[in-house]
């Protein structure tokens, strides 16, 4: 028996962190959509690495908000 509550959606069980991952993913798409027209990606050396770091920061902020 697990100590953490499990979300069950249509018979599929998800860990409690799943909601935080989805919220941070939605925030990531919004922030990326805002940053692309500003031209910030022209100053970034590696856009994929920047996107990964941005998602990690947003996930950290989201998880701190929920805890």
Curated annotation (Swiss-Prot):
The keyword Transmembrane helix applies. Pfam families: DUF1656 (PF07869). One of its GO terms (cellular component) is plasma membrane. Its main location: membrane. It is found in: Cell membrane. The chain crosses the membrane at residues 3-23, 39-59. It is a multi-pass membrane protein. InterPro entries: DUF1656. Keywords: Cell membrane, Membrane, Transmembrane, Transmembrane helix. HAMAP family: AaeX (MF_01546). Belongs to the AaeX family. This is Protein AaeX. It comes from Yersinia pestis. The lineage of its organism: Bacteria, Pseudomonadati, Pseudomonadota, Gammaproteobacteria, Enterobacterales.
């Amino acid at each position: 028996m697990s100590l953490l509550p499990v979300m069950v959606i249509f018979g599929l069980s998800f860990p409690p962190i799943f909601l935080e991952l989805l919220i941070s993913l939605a925030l990531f798409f919004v922030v990326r959509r805002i940053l692309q027209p500003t031209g910030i990606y022209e100053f970034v050396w590696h856009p994929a690495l920047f996107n990964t770091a941005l998602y990690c920061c947003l996930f950290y902020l989201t998880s701190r908000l929920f805890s």
